[in-house]
Amino acid sequence: MYKVFRIIMLSVMLCLCASPAWSQSNATKITWNGHAAFGITTPKGKVLMIDPWLRNPSNPAAKNKHDPVDDIKKTDYILITHGHFDHVGDSVELAKKTGARLVTNYELGTNMAKLLGYPKDQMGFDTLINIGGTITIADGEVTVHMTPAIHSSGLQIPNAGPNEPDIVYGGTAAGFVIKIKNGPTIYDTGDTAYFSDMKLIGRHYHPDIALINIGGHFGMEPDMAVMAAEAVKARYVIPHHYATFPVLTQDPTPFAKAIKKHHMTPVVMKPGETVTYEDGKLK
């Protein structure tokens, strides 16, 4: 009788472990690779890379002549907010290595394929959008909304000839709202300046996490970034786009202190650090 009971219990446990509800994690992982480069791994294991300038000087994986692109084994989608070199970054090499599809505006995607060699078959109307547009990717697990940004978007051509322009049209700069099933809603501002309609982004999408540029000079100064965070009202605020170059803000501490006064939680990450969002909490 005892043996029969053990067999029944073992069978029940095996069934539970095999069921999606038991085995599937609801954890979303966010890695900051320095500057504006983020990696997101969804609960189902899809990998999104945002503005993947992995070789930036803040990334510890780029130290001592090590190539951080070598460390990336999987990328399903590359999301690019605008055409500047520090956001296009290493996307072409990453795409050729992993087969990642490109999510960006149509003009930038087209020129990246023609002038930089991004594989043309790794983009299309399923991934190229414009401000106000929405796409669903990752087998329905991820929804991406392209939001406005006040910034420029020239695409730099490294091998331009003497009679050719060094910078070509890269569409309109943008931000992204990324909704992940069984995970967070993440708003990445891109390099935008503050604009009052950020309140509408917060009101409409209710982001759990905001990735906000604070570096100044080429984007929002920290005090303006605080206004942006207050407008969006995300529960967690992660600063980025700082301390990469001397002209940028070096210390995020004053920004983090101001965010606390607005009853939000600042999450100041170190380059290379990964945080996990699970059960409504970022840790």
Describe every region a protein language model picked out:
Residues 24-28, 42-48, 134-144, 179-186, ...:
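Beta-strand-turn-beta hairpins that frame and shape the catalytic cleft
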Residues 49-55, 131-135, 141-153, 193-194, ...:
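Conserved catalytic scaffold of divalent metal-dependent phosphoesterases
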